């Protein structure tokens, strides 16, 4: 059965939802699923903006057949070539062999790499700032390289103010998009903050003209557009959303966890209302990365393991580096029963491998567990965190 939605009078959502996929990109848990968005423009000429993952191809074709109602598909606009959006290209070409493909040079190169038969079809290669008319609707193509692949572009329908934004402004989950927006951006495109800043600057002249944002994942945005755009601006500058403390602990037998909880209590006693605590072993790293983008301060509490950093904590550090987390104030708590090494190793990683991370001099160092004689260290660290908030 077809399932379509009107975005505007002439633009239809014809995509598909996937509630079977458990790991997005085979890496990120998506318990609420994901949507693959595709948009069909009905004008003097018809145009499909991107396709969907292979798993949603049948639904896409059924939706398109319903909206087209016997009309041919004239154009296929490809903004992004990642397989979860390009997976149905070949079926589109088989169903509508006379369709003209509109995209850019790098995208056509990638289509050939993925073995799509583009050489057998008419193509229109566009460049930055080019325009194209489908009749009533005139669109402008704006290149957005590395948001988050090199071939990415966005398409702006100047007639109705619709921005087809590729993966930008997308979210995990089929519903309640705002809830998952930070987690999506920080993990999927978070590494490329400078490139997001570039596309935001390019879009500066048309921001007041945008009435709809149509991403390739998640809901279409029709309200509070500037709120969402400002969030993207903050995240892509690697600025925290708010002053607060995120405590991440690695604990084998509960002793490091107990110390982390004690620090959280001290911070709350001193008036800090925004404190979040996470077990690095039981929290998916994508959630940790998302929360790291939210808070100004980070506490890393790790047991020493085989004379190194606990593996799950090390993995978290590596992910922070890979996704370009920066400009945070960090406090360290370390534990070990005979060789307390984790603190120095974490500090070395933060100093040498990451950008603009301010590591507080104050530290809590424990031998097996937190004892009363370490209460002063705990109090001093809590005071240092609070003072650094000023």
Q: Model-derived features: where do they sit?
A:
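Conserved beta-strand hairpin/beta-sheet module of binuclear metal-dependent hydrolase folds
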Residues: 4-65, 154-157, 161-165, 256
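Metallo-beta-lactamase
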Residues: 5-9, 103-152, 195-198, 202
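Active-site metal-binding motif and surrounding structural segment of the metallo-beta-lactamase
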Residues: 44, 55-102
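Structural motif
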Residues: 45-47, 75, 137, 161-164, ...
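Active-site neighborhood of phospho(di)ester-bond hydrolases with catalytic His/Asp-centered motifs
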Residues: 49-51, 73-81, 101-104, 163-167, ...
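Active-site-proximal loop/helix segment associated with metal-binding centers of metalloenzymes
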Residues: 148-152, 168-193, 238-241
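FMN-binding flavodoxin-like domain, especially the glycine-rich phosphate-binding loop
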Residues: 175-213, 217-220, 262-276, 288-390
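Short N-terminal or domain-adjacent regulatory/targeting segments
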Residues: 212-241, 315
């Amino acid at each position: 059965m077809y399932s379509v939605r009107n975005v505007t009078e002439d633009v239809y959502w014809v995509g598909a939802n996937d509630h079977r996929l458990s790991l997005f990109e085979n890496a990120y848990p998506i318990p609420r699923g994901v949507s693959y968005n595709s948009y069909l423009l009905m004008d003097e000429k018809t145009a499909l903006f991107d396709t969907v993952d292979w798993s949603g191809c049948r639904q896409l074709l059924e939706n398109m057949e319903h909206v087209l109602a016997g009309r041919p598909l004239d154009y296929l606009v490809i903004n992004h070539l990642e397989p979860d959006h390009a997976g149905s290209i070949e079926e589109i070409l088989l169903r509508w062999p006379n369709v003209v493909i509109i995209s850019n040079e790098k995208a056509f190169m990638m289509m050939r790499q993925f073995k799509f038969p583009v050489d057998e079809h008419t193509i229109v290669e566009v460049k930055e700032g080019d325009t194209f008319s489908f009749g009533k609707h005139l669109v402008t193509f704006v290149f957005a390289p590395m948001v988050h692949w090199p071939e990415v572009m966005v398409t702006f329908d100047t007639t109705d103010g619709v921005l087809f934004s590729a993966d930008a402004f997308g979210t995990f989950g089929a519903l309640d998009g705002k809830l998952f927006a930070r987690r999506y951006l920080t993990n999927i495109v978070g590494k490329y903050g400078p490139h997001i800043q570039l596309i935001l600057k390019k879009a500066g002249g048309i921001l007041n003209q945008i009435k709809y944002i149509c991403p390739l994942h998640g809901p279409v945005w029709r309200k509070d557009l500037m709120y969402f755009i400002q969030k993207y601006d903050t995240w892509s500058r690697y600025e925290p959303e708010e002053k607060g403390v995120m405590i991440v602990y690695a604990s084998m037998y509960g002793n490091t966890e107990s110390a982390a909880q004690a620090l959280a209590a001290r911070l709350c006693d001193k008036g800090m209302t925004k404190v979040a605590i996470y077990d690095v072993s039981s929290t998916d790293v994508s959630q940790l990365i998302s929360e790291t983008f939210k808070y100004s301060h980070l506490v890393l509490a790790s047991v020493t393991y085989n004379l190194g950093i606990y593996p799950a904590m090390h993995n978290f550090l590596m992910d922070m580096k890979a996704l370009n987390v920066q400009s945070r104030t960090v406090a360290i708590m370390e534990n070990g029963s005979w060789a307390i090494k984790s603190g120095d190793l974490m500090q070395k990683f933060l100093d040498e491998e990451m950008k603009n991370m301010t590591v507080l001099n104050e530290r809590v160092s424990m031998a097996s567990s937190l004892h009363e004689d370490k209460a002063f260290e705990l109090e001093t660290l809590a005071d240092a965190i609070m003072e650094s908030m000023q």
